[in-house]
Each structure stands twice: as structure tokens, then as C-alpha cells.
């Protein structure tokens, strides 16, 4: 065999090997195989971000693998809300954890979705540079603050605080930024502050470059941010699957609120297997203190959503007065109210 032929064959073999390795390591084969299942047997795909406001999504997926019911859905992590929005519209995901104002905005635009459950209460904060010039909210005038989306509860939270301090809308510059990017931006002094959900406020605290100016509950009692939405076609065709999803999320919320060991265990397996974050960071966010973010009860309430809607209209991101019944389906949360916590002891499967 000539040298040229040997080199060519070697190159082809190497290319095949690299391609195979890439496919093995980077292709989600479970998702690929799921797409070939009959529609009525496919597991639904649920979108989420690596934030504690959406912790019940990976917790439900992880614990259900060790329960008698088995895996209930396929979680898919994204890095920002714009990507989730597009995936939801195109039916690449059938359910998603998104911020409440975005859900209302999508519904107003005609996107066929319904809110079926909340993701949490509390868990967001405004963080400033630790040794920076901002000592009180009054010092925010003229400063740049990162928010996850113009359709976010964090943006509305800032407006509520601005009202209290007599700050006009144009006096604070708000910029949209993917949540995982904000700690680095604050550390690099690219922004003066950020309003985000955990664990990013905790990351700034642990890193020594950020200080929590205030928690969301200080300006917004019973604060909520992330909620669970489901496409209408899934509700119409497979309501039983939607109920199983909501039941699982409800059980995870109760499980997380049961004890500190439960939260510490969740910090370990979610940090390692889902969020790609240090478990110590999540432990800080989930336990210092325990009510920094809560996960029960999480049934959608009309008063909460009416307030979000009215704030959106007031701040110019919604031009339609949607009624609660137009964008929610509460039968699933009503049924889930009878659920109990997962019977799962911390540490049972974490080491596997």
C-alpha cells in the first residue's frame, strides 16, 4: 500500500472516530429517540434556566427517576429567556419555566400557552458592588442595572422600589442580560447592579464583590417570578400528562420546604447533574436563610397576576388588559393541592 493511500485512510479513520466521539458526547440521544415515538407516547420536553426559581424542575426529574413512576418528562436547560420563548413558540419544548410578565406578553401576542403553576416565591434580589457608591436605593440614579428580560418580575420590582424612592423611570438604565452572565459583569464593573434570581446574588456575595441591597420581599410581599406554562395543544390532547407534570412539581416544592437536609441534598445533585454549578453556591442560596426562596404553596392566584398585569401596562410592556381566566388553567393546581411530599430520603441516590 502506498504511503499516500495509508495517510488518506488514516485521515478518514481519524475523522470517523472524531465524528463518532462528538455524536456520543454532544448529541442528546434520549431526545432524538423520543422524537421517533408516537405522539401519544412521547415524553414532553420542559425548558428551564439554571436558577433556584426553577429548582423544582430538575428536582422532579431527578427524584422521579428513583420513584415507582419513573421519568416523567425531559428537562432541557437554556441560558436565557429569549431562547426559551422561541423554543416554546416553535413547539421544540411543550412546557417551560418563564417569568410571569413574559407569559402574559406571549399570551397577548396570541401564543397558545396557559399558566398552570408557579415555580417559587421570593428568591430574587437587587445586588450592588460591595464597596461601590450605592449605599441606598436613592444612589441608583444614573446607574446601570442588569435585568433578565424587559418582560421580567425583576424589572417590575425595580419600578416598585423606584416609586417608593421617588425615582423617575429614565433615571435608571436597565439592560437585559442572561442570568449566568451578571456576576462576571458586576465583578468587572461593566454594570453597577443587577436584579436577578438566585443563585446569582449568592454568587456575588460568596465571591466578595457583591452585596445584597434588598431582597424582593422588602418591596413586594409574596413576590413571585418564574411560573410554569404549557402549550394549549398539549393541554387539549394530553391533560393527564400535564397533571402528572404539575403533581411532580408540587411534590418537589413540598419536599424542598420540608427540611434543610433536603435542600442541601438538592443543592448537591442539581449543582452537579443539571446546573453545572458548585453545590456550595446552591447550598448558600437555599439555606441562608431557609426562606430566601420558598417552594410551597404555588397555586396561581388571581390577585398576584392582576398586579403583574397592571404593572406591565403602567410600565409600557403590555397594552391589553388580559383577564386571569384567559391565560391560566387552574384545574391542574387544584388537583395538585392534594399531593404530598416525595418519599425520598436525602442522599439515597446522589452518589450514583
Across the structure, where does each feature detected by a protein language model lie?
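Soluble non-cytosolic domains of exported or imported proteins
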Residues: 78-82, 97, 148, 152-153, ...
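Secondary-structure end/capping motifs
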Residues: 236-320
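Solvent-exposed, polar/charged alpha-helical surfaces in well-ordered, non-transmembrane soluble domains
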Residues: 55, 86, 90, 104, ...
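Short, glycine-/small- and polar/acidic-enriched structural segments
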Residues: 23-168, 173-176, 192-198, 209-214, ...
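Pocket-lining segment of extracytoplasmic ligand-binding domains
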Residues: 101-102, 132, 180-275
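Short, Lys/Arg-rich N-terminal segment immediately upstream of the first membrane anchor
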Residues: 1-5
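Conserved C-terminal helix/tail region of periplasmic/extracytoplasmic solute-binding proteins
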Residues: 310-352
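Hydrophobic membrane-insertion alpha-helices, especially the h-region
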Residues: 8-24
Amino acid at each position: 500500500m502506498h504511503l499516500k493511500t495509508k495517510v488518506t485512510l488514516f485521515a478518514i479513520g481519524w475523522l470517523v472516530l472524531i465524528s463518532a466521539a462528538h455524536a456520543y458526547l454532544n448529541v442528546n440521544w434520549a431526545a432524538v429517540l423520543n422524537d421517533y415515538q408516537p405522539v401519544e407516547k412521547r415524553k414532553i420536553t420542559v425548558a428551564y434556566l439554571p436558577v433556584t426559581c426553577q429548582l423544582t424542575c430538575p428536582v422532579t426529574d431527578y427524584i422521579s427517576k428513583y420513584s415507582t413512576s419513573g421519568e416523567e418528562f425531559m428537562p432541557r436547560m437554556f441560558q436565557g429567556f429569549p431562547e426559551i420563548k422561541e423554543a416554546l413558540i416553535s413547539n421544540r419544548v411543550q412546557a417551560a419555566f418563564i417569568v410571569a410578565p413574559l407569559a402574559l406578553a406571549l399570551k397577548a401576542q396570541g401564543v397558545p400557552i396557559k399558566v398552570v403553576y408557579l415555580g417559587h416565591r421570593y428568591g430574587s434580589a437587587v445586588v450592588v458592588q460591595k464597596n461601590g457608591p450605592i449605599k441606598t436605593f436613592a444612589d441608583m440614579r444614573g446607574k446601570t442595572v442588569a435585568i433578565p428580560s424587559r418582560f421580567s418580575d425583576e424589572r417590575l420590582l425595580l419600578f416598585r422600589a423606584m416609586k417608593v424612592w421617588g425615582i423617575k423611570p429614565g433615571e435608571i438604565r436597565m439592560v437585559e442580560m442572561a442570568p449566568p452572565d451578571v456576576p462576571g459583569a458586576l465583578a468587572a464593573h461593566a454594570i453597577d447592579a443587577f436584579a436577578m434570581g438566585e443563585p446569582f446574588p449568592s454568587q456575588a456575595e460568596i465571591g466578595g464583590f457583591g452585596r445584597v441591597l434588598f431582597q424582593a420581599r422588602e418591596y413586594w410581599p409574596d413576590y413571585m417570578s418564574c411560573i410554569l406554562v404549557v402549550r394549549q395543544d398539549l393541554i387539549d390532547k394530553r391533560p393527564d400528562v400535564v397533571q402528572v407534570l404539575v403533581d411532580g412539581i408540587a411534590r418537589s416544592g413540598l419536599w424542598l420546604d420540608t427540611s434543610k437536609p433536603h435542600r442541601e441534598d438538592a443543592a448537591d445533585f442539581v449543582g452537579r447533574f443539571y446546573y453545572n454549578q458548585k453545590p456550595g453556591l446552591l447550598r448558600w442560596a437555599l439555606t441562608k436563610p431557609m426562606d430566601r426562596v420558598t417552594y410551597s404553596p404555588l397555586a396561581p392566584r388571581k390577585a398576584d397576576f392582576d398586579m403583574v398585569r397592571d404593572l406591565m401596562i403602567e410600565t409600557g410592556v403590555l397594552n391589553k388588559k388580559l383577564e386571569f381566566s384567559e391565560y391560566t388553567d387552574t384545574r391542574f393546581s387544584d388537583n395538585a393541592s392534594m399531593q404530598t411530599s416525595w418519599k425520598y430520603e436525602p442522599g439515597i441516590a446522589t452518589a450514583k
